């Protein structure tokens, strides 16, 4: 770790390579969008963060106290290829000044190691980049105990960028998210179930620059709804917080009931998805959104055949994207693990509204049309009328309103605190404290002494309400409260 004696941290953002090969107009639009996104993200962290846009990069300078959170957000922002950490030193107008300053900050990094200096230069200096490399390298070699300079396989590479009289010493390089700036490629409505597939599909659309809204069809049970809201908020907050998007809930319990009445068993699954597409299409058109998205993958389950997907698509007259269409389940799970949605998916309450004992795998267009004519569409229209639209940044407040668990601020007799945070930290409180991460709570809670009352604890109380509701709705437990000391 470089000891930074300056009270600010500089980050240099390098644009995603695909942006740089676009035509001038498209490139200009994307880079302006990225700048606006970073301005919004930075302002949410601190008004003291300063941004400056260049033709090939964006520079951000932040007080050290905000550097870690800003770096994390930069690495999660679409449109960025690399994030460089740098120390900026001004008034570097001579080789003598440069060599002294570089040695001051980097001498500890090369102790007992081979090293090399790599420099880039912009400006009208009376020296070249190679002069910087040779001068700085020679000075550091003479003033430090090292294993020497190695031009090919150095253990430490010191990267310098000199812009006129401003020197950047690059101390760390991080791989960015890539993709296109959020909002530069239009808007899409993602059909969310909260499992592996829909969350990964939504992440991929966000990464590609699509402003991604979420729609959830509630087949029954509050636990599933609040779980999907939780993971949708997580995706938005982590990768897309520069834009406000919507979360739409459509009550589908009555639609499912009508399917059981009107549709043949083997076509129930296909018809359910067609009805979801019809409803989502109506919402998308009202919101001026051009496309829908699902997490379906060809042949992942027996009913997801090309024929069946075509039958589902025929219910829509707007574009339906399937980012996972050719991906295998292990690849999807790998991405879910990487982005942090795996544990949400594993902890998601299971609910199956329509179970086809013998689902059709190669459905008939004529048969689907016949089945569709049997369905009472007034039920679907009523469900769409009852849709609830929330801003994504408000859904957790909505969840807490739904929650009915008692909130307490002290530990009583016969009560045990359960710290459900994902981190390894454990709350210090009077009495016994158990550590059970939220994603293990459903499995582990049944093993606990049922004669005790358990106080669920997390940082803001939101996860406690969510997973307490899971246990209350799914397991019929009543010995649960939320702990807010």
Can you name each region flagged by the protein language model?
Residues 407-454:
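Positively charged, proline/Ser/Thr-rich regional signature most characteristic
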Residues 233-262, 349, 354:
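A conserved beta-strand->alpha-helix junction
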Residues 1-189, 202-246, 314, 362-363, ...:
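RNA-binding accessory domains that recognize and position tRNA/RNA substrates
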